[in-house]
């Protein structure tokens, strides 16, 4: 008897409540014991995901509901992790599209939804947070319908079932008025509307690996859905990368399946199930595991190419090695190679210089999260400004363009449009919701977006929503898309910052440092109020004499320094600057620390 199975993926924009909803599904299906300690937001398993509330790695969990095993796969909402999305969707038969009852569908959901509709998956729409003040449910459903229509959905896909829910309060309903209850209507909708893909458990084994995991105990772990046949621990199999790949003989060590959030060893698994296997050291994404006598491989999975490149350098500042455990080029190289094991959309290239690595990824977030992870693990390194990856088509250089959607209050619309015009953005659509907010859609080059996030938050006083998604490659736009308007303040000496000196420098610009911070020659300590760089002395104390002052001393009043996040730092720097990243600090510096070296370098580039 084949077991009752359903495989679904959840699509949601950042912060629309996907992970909270999954918590409720796990709780109410009885997957957690009554006395078990529940962690909030179960699916976001690493620290960065919990802090920022974004999902980076596609994760799986499973619930049992009335005898049916439901595999739930989380998809990353961010286009930067598009490499993950496409593979995940190949494992499921339907998608739950989760939209916020106030914000409606956002561009990051658009990316995943487009991929899902193209694969012919039927969506179930879940309107979440229906108890929020300001919920506009009809508008949200109309927006969702229009989005599906724009993305080329079939009539069958446009006839989608709708479930109204509040993940936080743990209820779902088929009517928007409900304010209590449980998740049963959502489970019922899944059982009713998710198709069961026909699969033959008695045919020869075929299993395609769609994502990888790594464990220090058993090595590489492959995750995938069994297309047909059965698999058990200790079984001899063959592995092929695509129909033309070499036939490699291998042996399965363990087979694991998902139950709740746990991975449980099973004696055998059959067609339709999503499983983890280990014991094959060289398993890779897209590999097909087949029965020994019928080595029929499935076509390889394609992953989007990287659009941004950054250089990772060994930290060479005077303060290098004081805070980090891993500082050498070999240690950084080993860590990057380890990352390639499961981060499929990443590329690492050696340059001629052994202290510099060229790392390419799907976007700024993709790369800065890698840097943030390394920093937390005790690495020290320096990173350069991101550059876009150009492609040559018929002798013409093409650069990546993105679709940008911003949602702003009407009063900030002018400033945002002016800034996007300066960055050579092309407006595609503009719609007001009649409640004082306007949604703008632009097509803009990835170069033009570098550094836009922090500028945008300033322009909208933190009230704007923005997100962007890779669209296509197109011929390079002429001229520089964006130059930083201000110069920087550069320290001329090594030492600790002195309050009196910083106070005297306040008229010259905003500071990044506070009194007592360790500084060195060539380090950037603030933003200059004009457009040129200025070398200053922030470690000079007040000259004291033995003549008594007739009045009182002037009181030193300092403006608080700008708090720098890694994203802000990476967006802020220019081509001749680097971000120094250590476990405790983020500092900005010039590539050449000495003034005469900088002058020589700028003469050579002219």
Regions found by a protein language model. Give the residues of each.
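Conserved P-loop NTPase nucleotide-binding/switch module
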Residues: 85-99, 104-148
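A short beta-strand-to-loop transition that corresponds to the Sensor-1 phosphate-sensing loop
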Residues: 101, 127-129, 167-168, 280, ...
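A contiguous, basic/glycine-rich beta-loop/short-helix subdomain that forms a polymer-engagement track
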Residues: 202, 207, 214-219
